[in-house]
């Protein structure tokens, strides 16, 4: 991963997602494409400082159902707990984020409930840094 990608990812995580992690957490960034609970739900997996787990799922409203978000939320929370990460963030990105916000929130809340260490972010696709949309695999810092 080049320094520009590292900086854009850190800026995205801090500014867009609101992460307040200390600087040293960003010394380790692992980025990879991973299979999701089924082939229709691919996502990018991002681990920051072995503390923060982020799944990024790009979709369009017709495909963004509460069931899809529920599956990704379950998978992410399970991984967070198994690997002892502090937080899990699910980013659902679409060209039409307002059209899927309600279904995404319903699917997320049905699984995460009051889990204060799990967060949903529904964003416009153009808010994602290029490094998170590239599809490159096994990129590490």
Task: Name every feature range the model reports, one short phrase each.
Residues 1-52:
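N-terminal, charge-rich interaction modules
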Residues 4-12, 35-44, 78-91, 136-141:
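A short, terminal or domain-edge coil/loop segment
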Residues 14-18, 22, 31, 74, ...:
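Generic surface-pattern signal
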Residues 17-22, 51-59, 84-88, 130:
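Generic detector of short, locally flexible boundary/turn motifs and exposed helical patches
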Residues 27-28, 48-70:
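Acidic/glycine-enriched edge-of-secondary-structure segments
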Residues 57, 93, 121-125:
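Conserved beta-strand termini and adjacent loop/short-helix elements that scaffold enzyme active sites
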Residues 59-112:
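Amphipathic protein-protein interaction modules
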Residues 107-141:
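Long, charge-dense
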């Amino acid at each position: 991963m080049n320094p520009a990608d590292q900086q854009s990812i850190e800026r995205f995580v801090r500014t867009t997602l609101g992460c307040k992690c200390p600087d040293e957490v960003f010394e380790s960034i692992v980025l990879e494409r991973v299979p999701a609970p089924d082939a229709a739900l691919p996502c990018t997996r991002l681990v920051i400082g072995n503390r923060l787990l982020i799944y990024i799922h790009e979709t369009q409203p017709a495909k963004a159902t509460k069931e899809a978000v529920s599956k990704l939320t379950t998978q992410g929370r399970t991984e967070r707990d198994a690997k002892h990460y502090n937080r899990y963030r699910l980013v659902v990105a679409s060209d039409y984020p307002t059209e899927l916000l309600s279904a995404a929130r319903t699917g997320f809340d049905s699984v995460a409930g009051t889990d204060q260490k799990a967060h949903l972010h529904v964003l416009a696709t153009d808010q994602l840094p290029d490094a998170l949309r590239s599809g490159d695999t096994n990129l590490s810092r």
